[in-house]
Amino acid sequence: MVAARARLDIATSNLANVSTDGFRKLTARGALTPNGARVGAERSNRRGEIRRTGREYDLAIVGPGHFSVRDAAGRVVDTRSGSFERTLRGTLADARGRTLLGDAGPLIVPQDATIDERGRVLAGDNDTHRAIPLPRDSTLRAGFLEESPVDPIAEMVGIVDASRSFETAQKVVGAIDSLRQKNASDIARVR
């Protein structure tokens, strides 16, 4: 039942994030231990398609890597979602207000600057030496976002399958309880 419940939770999470840019699908992984079944989630490395948005501060990483953003409490979080807006202070922030970090703290983007495929901020003909850190084999596409690679049909099938497994496990547990009660009453009658 634990495994079926975990598969159900993971499939519903994947389905809920089918439209979340940069989301990476979760997969259930389990193991039998002396103390019972252990189930966890593993994040997929499969990337989604790159979609043109035309918005200059939408950024997609092609290849491995992530964006680092800092929230108001100072926590740094890694994300693949590259939907950013330029703030009045010249930083880039996501919809939650988290600030995009460059290689030297918050990334400052001058008004008419662009961001190139290596993540460098270019103002006019000058490289401002501010950059979004990227692995060597990755590039950045400004005006694009990475879509979620989740297949909604496959996740719905997974939800139905996990629900059926859960229901079957519940019936088995109910049958075992009934047998225990019957055996206990049979033993009591014999005495």
Q: For each of these PLM feature ranges, what is it?
A:
Residues 1-191:
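Amphipathic alpha-helical polymerization modules
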